[in-house]
Curated annotation (Swiss-Prot):
One of its GO terms (biological process) is defense response to virus. This is Gasdermin bGSDM. GO terms for cellular component: cytoplasm; plasma membrane. The chain crosses the membrane at residues 69-85, 97-115, 163-180, 189-205.
Length: 266
């Protein structure tokens, strides 16, 4: 059993899993492989499965306003977890986090607020029908073996935003006020920093492009090369990340918990 990881669970109450490094190109119908608490992104579903004669790929619904998430806040997070999340967001935006911890050194807790959140999604019923009609690509070797071992997942929904707002509080529960120009000087020009006033406890970090920061997925079950079932991935149970680096040669490799431990050339 794994210890509870607050980084993984901060989106749980909203029904999503986290993307450890938010990205612009994460979307539904992508293939993931589990490695411990994380899921590695492998590629598009149409590179693994060949559509049958009757059912096409599910239709992607893009840029639907996620009204249930926009304007919502997380619960209180420790300042360490909050700054870790903020650091990954700033890194994805092309900003710097060096020196930011000194500005938040008097903070005890942090809270994130999600603004202008949009969702890309596919209907799970349509995906279920597609999987029932599709065949495994005959040229897929290692990933097809992972599919047969029930180690693969398909993304079904992603949430994205250009704005990530964080509010910090001190140990006595009062707001920690920060100076907007000071924060802007630390993170750099790639990130727009704003607030209700030049000195404020609630700071919005804005990217020029939407970044995907949460996802939903289903696990695939296959038997003798045929699709049998799907199972929703529990929210807050896993994080998505890029392929890891092998320590010996630096090459990207797919690592899994199953018998197929290292696959090169993915």
């Amino acid at each position: 059993m794994w210890c509870k990881d607050p980084f993984l669970t901060y989106l749980k109450e909203f029904g999503y899993n986290v993307i450890r490094l938010p990205k612009a190109d994460v979307k539904p119908l992508q293939v993931l492989a589990r490695c411990g608490k994380d899921l590695n992104r492998l590629g598009e579903i149409n590179n693994l499965l060949v559509a049958g004669d009757s059912i096409p790929l599910p239709r992607l619904k893009e840029n639907t306003r996620a009204a249930s998430i926009s304007g919502q806040r997380t619960g209180d997070l420790s300042v360490g977890v909050g700054l870790s999340i903020l650091g990954t967001v700033l890194g994805a935006m092309g900003g710097s986090k060096l020196g930011l911890d000194t500005k938040y050194q008097n903070a005890k807790t942090t809270m994130f607020e999600f603004q202008d959140v949009f969702e890309d999604t596919v209907e799970i019923i349509e995906l279920d029908k597609f999987l029932g009609d599709a065949d495994i690509n005959p040229f897929s070797r290692h990933v097809a073996e992972l599919l047969e071992a029930d180690d693969l997942y398909i993304t079904t929904s992603t949430i994205k935003s250009t704005k990530f707002t964080i509010e910090a509080k001190k140990s006595d529960g009062t707001a920690l006020e920060l100076t907007i120009p000071d924060i802007q000087g630390i993170v750099g020009g790639n990130v727009k920093v704003s607030g209700a006033a030049s000195v404020t406890s609630k700071i919005c970090y804005e990217s020029p492009i939407p970044l995907v920061f949460g996802f939903q997925a289903v696990r695939l079950f296959y038997d003798n090369g045929r699709y049998t079932a799907i199972e929703p991935l529990d929210s807050g149970s896993a994080g998505m990340k890029a392929l890891g680096k092998a320590p010996s040669d630096g090459a990207a490799r797919l690592m899994t918990d199953g018998p197929f431990l290292r696959l090169t050339g993915v």
